[in-house]
């Protein structure tokens, strides 16, 4: 077993060096860290193993990322752009979801297995979308707000649908009760946390450490309560972020976010989340598929349905071709939700190993390639503006 000093030296070296090296090639930081994870992980050079400590740190990184995503959502802009976000989310949910279900039927997965395919086709990756928008400084823009809000709405619905699929897969009969509990859970968080936070954060106005402690405290309360109901921790973390954001003034928001939480999250925990994602990815499955037709059908249809639905929705909303393209591409990446869905589907016997491997390949390709393409388009757009 490696010394933890050695492990953390390797991790910090990657986090510090690799993104700066690959930045010259317009490769986003999250992609470069994931690629590094694939190379050093057990399916690559086997330099590091993913142990329980790294898994815990990665899980906390995902929680921090989702909380910061919620905290970054400008609630006033969200209210102004809710209708537009809803249009994008409906296109991005229904078209790929229906397409995924039909392809599942074509592949002979049955009703529940096809529902699982619908979840996988419809799912976004809030983590990757938010990280790309953050890196490109687009979170606060109108396009960024619409895309992030729509991604969140879609992921909430797909997580709920995944929960329903799990209930059906294990023969559950309380799906309606679960959905009611989930709605109540989200409602209570959005109503209770803002008023509570205004009072408590006001008491600790000049005590920054205590403010951070309070934020972490409510995040974990929300997660623990959510787990009792059966709600994924990232949902609770995101809702907490939105609720806390509602309680803050702009100055408090910038101070809490930029001076404290961003440093904690992006300085350590969030990069570990992406590094571990790469380390746990067996890239060889892409090259070892016995049925290439299955991979091509799934990959081409999933990417095409997502991109087309996003492009059309943003065109309806009046954006130009470049922004439609960027927005359409940002609906494509799949990683956490799709891999969780695939893993659960295999455990429940809803899909076989061949389908599972295909979904892993889909997740790896979309999560790795999409950020690179988006950043290249964004840089090209900026260069064109500079020349003009």
UniProtKB/Swiss-Prot annotation:
Keywords: Antiport, Cell membrane, Ion transport, Membrane, Sodium, Sodium transport, Transmembrane, Transmembrane helix, Transport. InterPro entries: Cation/H_exchanger_TM, Na+/solute_symporter_sf. It is a multi-pass membrane protein. It comes from the Archaea. Belongs to the monovalent cation:proton antiporter 1 (CPA1) transporter (TC 2.A.36) family. One of its GO terms (biological process) is proton transmembrane transport. It is found in: Cell membrane. GO terms for cellular component: plasma membrane. This is probably a Na(+)/H(+) antiporter. This is Probable Na(+)/H(+) antiporter 3. One of its GO terms (molecular function) is antiporter activity. The chain crosses the membrane at residues 2-22, 27-47, 53-73, 81-101, 102-122, 146-166, 175-195, 215-235, 263-283, 294-314, 325-345, 354-374. Disulfide bonds: none annotated. It comes from Methanocaldococcus jannaschii (strain ATCC 43067 / DSM 2661 / JAL-1 / JCM 10045 / NBRC 100440).
């Amino acid at each position: 077993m490696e010394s933890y000093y050695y492990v953390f030296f390797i991790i910090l070296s990657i986090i510090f060096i690799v993104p700066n090296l690959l930045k010259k090639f317009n490769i986003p930081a999250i992609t470069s860290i994931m690629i590094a994870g694939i190379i050093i992980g057990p399916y690559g050079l086997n330099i590091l193993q993913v142990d329980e400590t790294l898994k815990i740190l990665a899980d906390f990184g995902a929680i921090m990322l989702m909380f910061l995503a919620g905290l970054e959502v400008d609630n006033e802009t969200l209210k102004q752009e809710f209708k537009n976000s809803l249009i994008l989310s409906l296109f991005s949910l229904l078209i790929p979801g229906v397409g995924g279900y039909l392809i599942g039927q074509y592949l002979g997965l049955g009703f529940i297995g096809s529902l699982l395919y619908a979840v996988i086709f419809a799912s976004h990756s809030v983590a990757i979308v938010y990280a790309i928008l953050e890196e490109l400084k687009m979170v606060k823009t109108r396009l960024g707000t619409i895309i992030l809000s729509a991604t969140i709405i879609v992921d909430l619905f797909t997580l709920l649908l995944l929960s329903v699929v799990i209930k059906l897969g294990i023969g559950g009969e309380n799906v309606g009760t679960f959905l009611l509990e989930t709605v109540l859970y989200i409602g209570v968080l959005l109503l209770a946390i803002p008023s509570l936070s205004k009072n408590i954060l006001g008491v600790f106005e000049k005590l920054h450490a205590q403010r951070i402690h309070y934020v972490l405290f409510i995040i974990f309360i929300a997660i623990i309560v959510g787990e009792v109901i059966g709600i994924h921790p990232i949902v609770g973390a995101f809702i907490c972020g939105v609720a806390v954001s509602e309680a803050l003034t702009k100055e408090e928001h910038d101070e809490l976010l930029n001076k404290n939480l961003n440093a904690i999250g992006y300085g350590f925990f969030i990069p570990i989340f992406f590094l571990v994602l790469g380390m746990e990815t067996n890239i060889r499955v892409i090259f070892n598929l016995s049925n290439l037709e299955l991979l091509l059908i799934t990959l081409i249809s999933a990417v095409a349905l997502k991109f087309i639905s996003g492009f059309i929705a943003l065109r309806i909303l009046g954006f130009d071709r470049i922004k439609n393209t960027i927005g359409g591409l940002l609906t494509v990446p799949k990683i956490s939700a799709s891999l969780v869905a695939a893993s659960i589907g295999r455990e429940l016997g809803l899909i076989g190993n061949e389908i599972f491997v295909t979904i892993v390949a889909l997740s790896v390709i979309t999560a790795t390639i999409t950020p690179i393409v988006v950043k290249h388009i964004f840089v090209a757009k900026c260069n064109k503006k500079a020349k003009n």
